[in-house]
Amino acid sequence: MTKIDPYKSKEAWIKWKAKTQSIPGLSNINSTLILKYLDDMERGINVSILSKKGGRSYIRLKSSKSKLLFLIKSFQDTYNVDNIGNLTEEQLINFFSDMRKGAIKRKDGGIYKSVRDFTKNFKAFWHWYQKISNKAGKEIPDITVYLDSSGTKPDWVYLTESQVRLLCDNAKFEYKALIMFLFDSGIRAPTELVNVKVSDLINDCKELNIREETSKTFGRRIKLMICPELLKEYIKVKNLKSEDQLFDICPSVINRNLKILGKNVFGDEKSLAGQKYSEITMYDFRHISCCYWLPRYKSESALKFRFGWKNSDKIHYYSEMLGMRDTISDDDMLIDITKTEIEQELQKSKREREIQQDQIDTLHLQVQKLAEYIKQLEFNIRSNFN
């Protein structure tokens, strides 16, 4: 089964490249630079030594393209920079500062919430530009040194377990299975989700195999603890075969219907994670699942494995510690030395009890032997008198 691309990123990328000899709205120099940069990123050439080797994904390429085209065109229009190499550090800092303040707005009039993403994309481009210029014998200063790459995390929808079940109770049957599967597995949706086949469900739907070739990071086999029975019913009702997609869905349609369901069940209020219930999407269930499993897993490494994470900071990013509870106990208040002393005393008492028990057993055995001796003595005396 070929990996399914729910966003059709590869198809869109190839189509755009085929029809684009130069980029409309950009000067020849800037257009040539952007096309060369994107081509290098696709092939994995001239990338930072700190970055992973190999070409960038089509999703990443599309995202970089859209952000860079916006930035370079804005620099042209705002600062009359027909050669991006002539952009100054001050111009760059001022532009991104205006983006953060809301002086530069989106086409719909809204404020840019993820300025950090634009910053990171431009930094990557500029460092590439420095590298290729250096190879050509021209030294280019790093004007991105003081560029602020920090940013606030986007709001998301938080649901408790009881709220997830309430949402499920009010959903159509197909959505019940999807909601509980997302909640239980914490799978990346839609990218990993749409690539799950029925045959990836193992051990009577109690385990899920997320294949290496379909995962963003690494393949993994995880346990399903909440949704197995619902999945079995879903597969039976839908008459799905082994090689069928478990959820053959259109992500935009699913997300639209989830938002309607969220509003109908919870209203238009904000959840604890800042986003309105009426804005819930499949992606939110990865956050929600992390919050559910975090206090239940005994080790951080096991939790990271379940969610396909390599770095521990993802745990806080996805959970923000929502749903956590204080599990401190009286036993935890004993420092290691005190606990060791108590354990030693308990061990000593145990040994003393064992010695006492041995002494009692020995005494009991001696009493038994004495009783037998007296009994035999009485028998001998009676025999002599007779």
Residue map of PLM features:
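Conserved tyrosine-mediated DNA breakage-rejoining catalytic core shared by Y-recombinases
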Residues: 195-233
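Short, charged phosphate-coordinating catalytic segments
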Residues: 133, 182-205, 301-302
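Catalytic-site neighborhood detector that most strongly recognizes the C-terminal catalytic loop/helix
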Residues: 214-216, 307-344
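C-terminal secondary-structure termini that scaffold catalytic or DNA-interacting sites
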Residues: 2-20, 331-386
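Short, polar N-cap/turn motifs at the start of nucleic acid-interacting alpha helices
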Residues: 202-203, 278-279, 298-319
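Active-site/catalytic core of tyrosine-dependent DNA strand-transfer enzymes
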Residues: 225-277
